[in-house]
Amino acid sequence: RAAERGKCFIEYIPAENAWVPIEADGYIYINCMWIAGSMKGQGYSNELLAECLRDAAGQGRKGVCILSAEGRKREFLSDRKYMEHKGFSVADISDCGINLMYLPLAADALPPKFRECAKHPAVEGEGFVLYYTDQCPFTYYWVPRVQEAAAEHGIPLRVIHITDKETAQNAPAPVTTYALFREGKFVTQAIQSDKKFLALAGVE
């Protein structure tokens, strides 16, 4: 634990058990790498990633993979340019612009890939549809508030709480922590506050 105020951690898991719709047997999947507050710019991300790679190699894993994006799509995802700088390559790309990146640790490692449901994210139904898991504590706070705001303003919103690995690995989006759709099309993986959601719905 550092003395500075801020957040600095990495969370990873064998990809076979990851709650995302990817095919990456033998890999380690990075769920989250978060550097915030005064921790930024201190080299902690390099140290955390290096430790993850050391651990993966020590376990005899084929490689490490992570989701990324660029620009405004990057919220709550890793920075593609940073991951490329650290030796990662794009293995697959979803139609919504989210990349699955990987760094092989074994000579015979095949690139991981999205399942078809994640490669072409779409759902049926009108209005908004939200899929989410309990991976991030922000969903616990904001999802009920978005539901309340939608009900108050008569905005159609269907919420699907993913509570098991099988459902997560077959979800209709590359991100399961939070995946918001509108009129069947993927909108964002960024966790919405009630105000942001209402703005997205066109309510002033």
Where are these predicted regions, by residue range?
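Conserved beta-strand in the GNAT
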Residues: 5-16, 29, 34
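Local sequence-structure signature of Cys/Sec-based thiol-disulfide redox active-site neighborhoods
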Residues: 117-152
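Conserved catalytic-core motifs of GNAT/GCN5-like acyltransferases
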Residues: 67, 84-101, 187-190
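Conserved beta-hairpin
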Residues: 1-11, 180-183
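Conserved acetyl-CoA-binding loop-helix of GNAT-fold acetyltransferases
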Residues: 35, 41-57
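Conserved GNAT acetyl-CoA-binding A-motif
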Residues: 56-75
